[in-house]
Each structure stands twice: as C-alpha cells, then as structure tokens.
Amino acid sequence: MTGQELAGAEVEADVALAPLTTLRVGPVARRLITATSTEQLVAALRAPVGRDALILAGGSNVVLADDMSDLTVIRVANSEITVRDGIVRAEAGANWDDVVVTALAHGLGGLECLSGIPGSAGATPVQNVGAYGSEVADTIRRVRLFDRRTGRDDWVTPQDMAFGYRTSVLKHSDHAVVLEVEFALDVGGRSAPLRYGELARALDVEPGGRADPVAVRDAVLALRRGKGMVLDEPDRDTWSVGSFFTNPVVTTAQHERLAAEVDGPVPSYPAPDGVKLAAGWLVEHAGFGKGYPGDDAPARLSTKHALAVTNRGHATTADVIALARTVRDGVRTTFGIELTPEPTLVGCTL
C-alpha cells in the first residue's frame, strides 16, 4: 500500500500511537495512514485496508489497549474551516477549539461554551460533545458521513443522528465515518443561553441569559483551567480524556433515596428521563478524592478534578483501566449507581 494509491496520503509503518492521544497510552500500529485532505480520507476509507482500520483524529476521547496486533490506523487530519452566511463548515480533522475561535472571529455565537475542549471537529457529533450547559446538537446543521459498507458519502441532518446525552447513532457504529460538519450559528453575535449555574455566576448573568460570546469563552477557559481540563504538556493533570465518566441519570425515587442517605445536598439537575447526578460528586463521596490513589501511582485521579483519570507520565492502558474500574466499582458499592465511561474504549473494557 503506497501513498499514490491513497491520493497521496502518507503511509508509515510501526508507529507508536500513545503520542497521538491526550492520555498518552496505546499500542504500536503496524500501519498509520495520515489523510490531510478529505480526498485522501475518502480514498483511504475506500481502499481494502481501510474497511477495518481504526479511525483516529484528535485522540482526546479514546482509550486504546496496550497491545493490538496487526493494527491499521487512519489518522483524520483534514482541517479546513470555512464560514459563509452564518454557517461554519469544518472538516473532520480540524482542531475543535480552532472551530470555536473561527466562529467568534466572524462574530458568530453558539459555540463559545464549548471552548477549550480538546479533539477534532469530526468527533463532536459522535458523542454529542457538550459542556457548561451547551452541546453540539444545539447548533449542528448537518454532518457528512462516509459509509464503509457501501463506499458512499452523504450529508445527514440532526434528525438522522438521534442525539442524546453524550451520544448519537455514531457512537457505537464501526462503519460511519465523519468527513465534515456544518454548524448554524447566531449571526447576531449572541452567546448560547447560559444554563450552567457556575458559568452564569462567573459572568454575573441570570441562568438562561446571554452574554458577549468572547467573554463567555474567556470564562469557560478559566473554569476549565482550574479543573485541569485545558491541554498543557507539562501539567500531568491534563494527560487524560477529560471526564472519564458521564453524569448518570437516575429515577426520582433513586435520587430521593440517595438524598436521604447522605449528609448535605446532592448536586442534581433535571433531565428529560429522570434526574442527572454529578458523577464527580459521587466519585469523591465514594472515597476517591482528587489525586487518588497517591503520588507513586502511574495512573491517578487528577489533583484538580476527581472525574479525570490521568497518566502521570509512565502509565499503561492497563493502569488506567484498573483505576477506572476501581472507581466505578466503588461508586456502585457505595451508592448502587453505575457509572458509564465517556471515552470510547478500543480493545479494552471496564
């Protein structure tokens, strides 16, 4: 397999994948194909080698097993971002925060609450990326998908995506690959509604109100930095996939039972199908504080945010999974609540 057969895409052999992920763990790929244009990406996906290849973009929401034999990886690195009539179109490999900055530079509001989230634009619809009261489902206009079963690519609408809390039809699909995403934004330059209390207070705005989008971005970045959620190479608290678990949604009865069993308030938020609990609160109150299990551990909970499982510089995937499993099991034992991993686990399970 050569680059000429893949519209010029670079092909490398025996490439360590750990440096290509924010958690910095993973195997050595037998073959790495880097597609820097949509043409190259489609060519790689249509080639026989691409049918079962692992798709990797920003590497910020994936945990790769330590050993995966005979692995071919297609690295999504197409990165063009264009703006027209309030529509931002981003190729799948575009850096997500660059998409946010581009929107703001054109006076467009709607993405600012999602500032500082690592990863690529193409990953955002897969798990309906969200933070601080916003999610990409609020603004996605359409998504261009390649179907590895048929070799076709088509634009689909949000209605086709079945967006939910940190999920979509793409999250558990091995055949649909995002090529491009379009976002329909506020041409009046208004921010998204500020639904998240901590963010609204930081901006001195009533919950549900709006603010200058640039000011919202600055406030979001400050909050994320305080939790070790903005990538910073020297800061090992940022060597993670962000929040390792999603906030669980429980029934009203479960919430009432939990509130009766603990001292003090239980952070919770209304959800369409129940009550959403703060996973970080559950983790800490199950006995897993920031920095657990201690300084000498290769994988630890972040010292800033107990929901992030971090690599302190020499962890393996096995170390990360073992810690995440301990936390999950501890929360289940303490509260009877099951935490669900937020990142995609490849070749490994909890």
Swiss-Prot record:
GO terms for molecular function: FAD binding; UDP-N-acetylmuramate dehydrogenase activity. It is an enzyme of class 1 (oxidoreductase). GO terms for biological process: cell division; cell wall organization; peptidoglycan biosynthetic process; regulation of cell shape. SUPFAM superfamilies: FAD-binding/transporter-associated domain-like, Uridine diphospho-N-Acetylenolpyruvylglucosamine reductase, MurB, C-terminal domain. This is UDP-N-acetylenolpyruvoylglucosamine reductase. Its main location: cytoplasm. Its EC number is 1.3.1.98.
